[in-house]
Amino acid sequence: MSYVDAIYNQDADKICLSERVDGKRVLLEYKPKYEFYYEDRAGKYKNIYGNSVSKIKTRSKGEFQKEVAVHRGQQLFESDINVINKCLEENYKGKDSPKLHTAFFDIETDFHSEKGFSPPSDPFNKITAISIYLDWSKQLICLAIPPKAMSMESANIIADKFENTIMFEREADMLSTFLDLVDDADILSGWNSESFDIPYVVNRITRVLSKNDTRRLCLWDRLPRKKKFEKYGAEQETFVLTGRVHLDYMLLYQKYTYQEMHSYALDAIAEYELGDKKVAYVGTLDHLYNQDFEKFIDYSRQDTLLLAKLDKKLKFLDLANEIAHANTVLLLQTMGSVAVTEQAIVNEAHERGMVVADKVKQSEGNTQAAGAYVAQPKKGIHKWVGSVDINSLYPSVIRALNMAPETIIGQIRPVSTDKYIVDKMADYRKANGRMYKGTNFAGAWEGLFGTLEYTAVIEQKQGVSVVVDWVNGDETTHTARELYEIIFNAKSNWTLS
């Protein structure tokens, strides 16, 4: 058993979670875990710095918030961790990921002779076709509305030439059938579907059926949640589904491939990855729809089939699923990197019997992070202009400076550094007899650029002895000056760490 998606229902004070068990969807509920830690010398728990902390556990979110406010003046730990991630860690850590049901889909829309194609935010044109590939049943299904000039009899003759192709007179019936078909899907995925297909479908269902019918795209009777994002410098709107997860396969492809493509159009990516292409046609898609409906159906089906073929080869949905369950995060959280990394750190700290500090809240400002120097170009025509683009800069620097890990054949033993850090962290008594608390691990390193042994070698100190542990198990003792000569002046091709 393992999870698909989850939400925190604050009003009902519960976590609603969906599982996929033996091919069946199972809906569960969990009680949220309201607890955090604060610094306390008498505490039974340890933070990542080795200091003692105490736990506070409450029964409700209201009590939790009150306790957090009471202890606000102290260093707090884990008061800001999402209750969903706490639930996933407690109940699903180490569990296998489920075999998800995925529905790949693609829509085609009508064309208005005066207004043109409609944007997803104002879908005044009807949806003319929806193709869906259900991976759990390996079925490619096409739903379509024939052109106005074509009779249903003629449309059905064309539909009979394809498997699982159904004609509709009313768009409302087609949309309702689509919702029925994807009802058992855990994931909806399309190409550029975050920007187009999902917002168009949600807004069109609202217009043709009702806003209440959009709940059928989600679980737990939830409405799709509006989300704004920026693309090409403009703000756009999409929808986040609940329980049934939407993942844009184009964004997955951009995230998990490491080469920059000249075009991220489905046609270009399919040709590059599969040697396959979309159905070619002459003229506009509107002309194809009205003049060659059979090829239009083939075109719609092929787009969705290409998506299924891409995932069969690349398995990016499986990758996202494994990453989510390895780190006890939700599938949507894998589209970023911060939430996954943070939860992985939390999980590892808990494995070691430690708790992590709350994130430091920084005030938002206009200060940008330091980056590369960017020269402002001088306008005009220039002669002899050159440009150098260094590919794989960091790996190239590592090779050029002989810094690769395989060159490390020994390690300098940090004896003096370890003692220095321990002494800094230890409690101590001053001349007045009062005891003072030592610093934490991070504070012990304040003012140090590197280990004491590293500094001694770089400064070529003659009177400092340093022990080296070699990869073959031997150990030798040298002065810091001798090691400097061995590393930098002996023309050796190896490195000491």
Q: Residue ranges of each PLM-predicted region?
A:
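Non-catalytic nucleic-acid-binding interfaces of large nucleic-acid enzymes and RNP effectors
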Residues: 1-80, 183, 207-240, 275, ...
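Conserved RNase H-like, two-metal-ion catalytic cores of nucleic-acid enzymes
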Residues: 4-45, 85, 89-187
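Short helix/loop capping segments that flank catalytic or ligand/cofactor-binding pockets
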Residues: 112-115, 141-142, 198-199, 255-257, ...
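Short secondary-structure boundary/capping segments
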Residues: 119-121, 199-212, 324-326, 400-407
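Conserved DEDDh/DEDDy metal-dependent 3′-5′ exonuclease domain
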Residues: 143-260
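Acidic, Mg2+-coordinating catalytic module of metal-dependent nucleases/exonucleases
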Residues: 183-197, 201, 242-245, 249-341
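Catalytic nucleotidyl-transfer cores of nucleotide-processing enzymes
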Residues: 229-242, 362-497
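Common nucleic-acid-contacting/processivity interface regions adjacent to the catalytic cores
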Residues: 286-429
